[in-house]
């Protein structure tokens, strides 16, 4: 475009046109000519062939729908499971945890009692150990006297006194009488063969003797 003296543009030679129009592409021009030369039946046949070669979406759509339904069922199962877990959690928080706290407090009291009992058992064991040591010491200190007394009695030749079984005690003021004898006191040789002892005191004392 060129401007004239009056300021109005006027067309000039090959000025103001795009490069593709000034120099058209030969290949594109050939395709336009070929499309223009093709008859209408060929175009319709091409469209029918394209429709025939295009797969029908029915089977694929059905498969997708089945997949979506399966996912929805699984989602529903998951939601029901989540609700069940939520209800169980609420029950645990509201009911079971207070019971557990009470049991915990009770167990702490039991543990304290067990600790006190263990301390008492240790103290008793300590005292028993001391008492046992004292008993052993007393046995060591006084155990020789009864043994010496038994040895002395055994060497004295008085076996009759070891076999006397008495049902009572004989008072100091008591006269021994043998059955069938006189009222005089019995001698030591007669006492050795006593089968029955009678006392003139307030009560009778009976003894059995085995020679």
UniProtKB/Swiss-Prot annotation:
InterPro entries: Cappuccino
Cleaved signal peptide residues: none
Chain residue ranges for the region called Disordered: 1-21
Expression across tissues: Brain, thymus, spleen, kidney and placenta. Overexpressed in most breast cancer cell lines.
Marked site: Breakpoint for translocation to form BCAS4-BCAS3: 60-61
Cellular component GO terms held in the UniProt record: BLOC-1 complex; cytoplasm
Lineage top rank: taxon: Eukaryota
Localization per record: Cytoplasm
Primary location class: cytoplasm
Keywords carried by this UniProt record: Chromosomal rearrangement, Cytoplasm, Proto-oncogene
Entry's family note: Belongs to the cappuccino family.
Disease cited in the entry: A chromosomal aberration involving BCAS4 has been found in some breast carcinoma cell lines. Translocation t(17;20)(q23;q13) with BCAS3.
Identification of the protein by name: Breast carcinoma-amplified sequence 4
Gene of this entry: BCAS4
